[in-house]
A protein has these predicted regions:
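Auxiliary alpha/beta "docking" domains used to position bulky ligands
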Residues: 8-297
Length: 297
């Protein structure tokens, strides 16, 4: 349904904010606690040509609302609970991606049904957004999501170690997806969040530790004997951001849970860590076996 033009300007002034708030409420409940709005133009100005998001010919065009979705360690309890109870997640080939995609679909539906932010540039109901998943690198879907996080004020992209560093969570974040609402105009410059400072730029000791850890991690690829510990070297790069010279065992307070770390770096552990973790989570599978056994009696 379209609104009268006399109401359109007033509605558009808060549309991006209302839509983002509705998405944030739904996504945070699923452990996706990083939800940041930005103007699509800001991203396209810094993105490599192959990773730019083409604006649509109608609607807000280059100034469309983009919403970056990510997570801190908060994702793990929500994900493991779903993996533990829901075969659609627990039996999926890529359960985290499946969980995130489902959470985003549900959040879009919730936001669309809410009163706030339901009107677009035409004065009509907003179409569903285009969704760009960070793991999809196919032509037309590739997004330089770390650069987007940088211009959206989410995390500082350190160009030397290639980590996105959040003010609260440090390097312990994951950037999952981007939603582009072509019918809603994104925030203007007055509402632009500043990029957080790089903590390594003002801490020479931390800079040195991270650079050394990064160089050591790269050396692991040239050293066959280091294959078993290669993933640990990359974890050490993240840990070096917050390393305390007085107590090297002290970890970042927002560091991932240990199983979350191992799951995240599974690609460098031969799949064993992820398989072990998933086997331990499938409580529903044991329940299903017991039920089937009871049915056979």
């Amino acid at each position: 349904m379209c609104r009268p033009l006399s109401l359109l300007a007033r509605a558009m002034a808060s549309a991006w904010s209302a839509r983002t708030a509705a998405l944030r409420a739904a996504l945070e409940a699923q452990g996706l606690d990083i939800v940041a709005p930005l103007n699509l133009r800001w991203y396209n100005e810094v993105a490599p040509e192959t990773a730019r998001i083409a604006p649509t010919a109608n609607g807000a065009g280059e100034d469309a609302l983009a919403v970056l979705v990510g997570n801190s360690r908060a994702l793990w309890p929500a994900f493991t609970a779903a993996h533990d109870s829901d075969p659609a997640i627990g039996d999926a080939e890529h359960p985290v991606d499946t969980f995130v995609a489902r959470a985003i679909r549900a959040a879009i539906a919730d936001a669309s049904s809410s009163r706030g932010g339901s009107t677009g540039m035409s004065g009509c109901d907003v179409r569903d957004p285009r969704v760009f998943d960070s793991h999809d690198t196919s032509p037309g879907k590739l997004v330089a999501i770390q650069r987007m996080a940088h211009v959206a004020g989410v995390a500082h992209l350190d160009e030397k170690c290639h980590l996105s560093i959040h003010e609260k969570h440090g390097p312990w974040i994951a950037l999952r997806a981007v939603l582009v609402f072509d019918d809603i105009e994104g925030p203007d410059e007055a509402n632009r969040a500043s990029t957080p400072p790089n903590p390594l730029a003002t801490n020479a000791a931390a800079r040195s530790r991270v650079d050394a850890a990064f160089a050591f991690a790269l050396e692991g690829y040239a050293d066959p004997s280091a294959s078993a510990e290669r993933w640990q070297r990359w974890v050490a790069v993240r840990d070096a951001v917050h390393a305390d010279p007085a107590d090297e065992t002290r970890k970042h307070p927002e560091r991932y849970y240990e199983d979350q770390v191992r799951y995240h770096y599974n690609c460098q552990t031969g799949g064993d860590a992820r398989a072990r973790i998933r086997d331990g989570l499938r409580a529903y599978a044991a329940t299903r076996v017991r039920k089937e056994a009871d049915d056979d009696v």
